Regions:
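Active-site beta->alpha loop and helix N-cap motifs at the rims of alpha/beta catalytic domains
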Residues: 2-144, 276-277
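C-terminal alpha-helical cap/extension of soluble enzyme domains
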Residues: 2-6, 17-21, 45, 198-201, ...
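Generic alpha-helical structural signal
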Residues: 36, 68, 72, 95, ...
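Short glycine-/small-residue-rich flexible loop motifs, especially phosphate/cofactor-binding loops
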Residues: 39, 98, 175, 193, ...
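Alpha-helical structural signal in soluble globular domains
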Residues: 69, 73-78, 100, 104, ...
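Catalytic alpha/beta core domains of metabolic enzymes, predominantly
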Residues: 139-249
Length: 297
């Protein structure tokens, strides 16, 4: 395991990374002032670090100039920053994005799962950028067990994030394999958050922390403590919020989290849009606001 991957693994252990959204208008325009205030607010409210341009941040859809500007604003906050790379049809896209992330001071990259040779893709990123990587077991493209073992032996891989949503056995497998390989087991399980910690996850990188950060941070804090009732209560609050935001159509969760961020005053209404997700009925917005405590039940 490369020393840089060891350093990232150890730095992230026990932390909550907010998988930040990218606030934008209905037409996809990004206001960097809004982005700066939004990212700073996530950190102020309990995020130990930031994952930008990942699945929640719609990284594959954004131009290199916008990507660079978002990374710069995240890095300026002085917390660990992980950048999502890959997911675009460009063959060299992930390697180019990783080089940019490294040059701008990011601490690591979260590698979108791709078709074909996943290990080869990680190796190409490692050769191009030499930046520590977090593998990604995502519900839209789960990682086969043998491939996962190979990835977790790569010297540049610091850990793996599991985001399988409802596959408890798959989540448990990823956590076990990561720990056996001496890598960091990172939960991205918004719908199995408390259980994934009990199964051995050592850090969190979740889209649920794109708003209402304190709800997720309270679960992490309670888990580190010794009060089982506090952990149960905090997990219950998180589960109620996740039930309203991480539901079918699942890709709509980004829009739901942006609605919640707007309800909290983190972003203006004009920038609470996800033009890349499925259309959602307006009545869902009220359900999300109620789950977040912004409308009476």
């Amino acid at each position: 395991m490369d020393i840089s991957a060891q350093v990232l693994r150890d730095r992230l252990r026990g932390t909550l990374l907010a998988a930040a959204a990218t606030p934008m208008t209905e037409s996809g325009e990004v206001d960097l002032g809004v982005v700066s205030r939004y990212l700073a607010g996530l950190v102020e409210d309990g995020a130990d670090g930031l994952a930008v341009l990942a699945h929640t941040g719609r990284g594959p859809y954004l131009s290199p100039d916008v990507r660079a500007a978002v990374i710069e604003r995240a890095v300026a906050l002085g917390v660990p920053v992980i950048v999502g790379v890959g997911g675009s049809p460009e063959p060299s896209g992930a390697a180019d994005e990783a080089r940019m992330a490294a040059s701008l001071g990011a601490d690591g990259v979260l590698v979108f799962p791709a078709e074909g040779d996943r290990l080869g893709g990680h190796e190409a990123i490692w050769r191009a950028a030499g930046i520590p990587m977090i593998a990604f077991d995502l519900y839209t493209r789960p990682c086969p067990a043998d491939t996962m073992r190979d990835l977790l032996r790569h010297p540049g891989v610091a850990g793996i994030k599991t985001a399988l949503l409802s596959d408890a056995m798959g989540c448990q497998r990823a956590i076990t394999l990561a720990r056996e390989a001496g890598r960091l087991a990172i939960t991205g399980e918004d719908r199995m958050f408390g259980p994934s910690l009990l199964w051995g996850a050592e850090a969190a990188l979740v889209g649920l922390a794109a708003a209402s950060v304190s709800v997720t941070a309270e679960v992490m804090a309670a888990y580190r403590g010794s009060d089982l009732r506090a952990f149960d209560a905090a997990s219950g609050r998180l589960d109620r919020l996740a039930t309203a935001t991480f539901t079918e159509p699942m890709e709509g969760y980004v829009q739901r989290m942006l609605w919640l961020a707007a309800a909290e005053g983190r972003i203006p209404e004009s920038h609470a849009h996800d033009p890349y997700g499925p259309p959602l009925p307006e009545q869902e917005r009220a359900a999300v606001a109620r789950a977040g405590g912004y409308l009476a039940m």
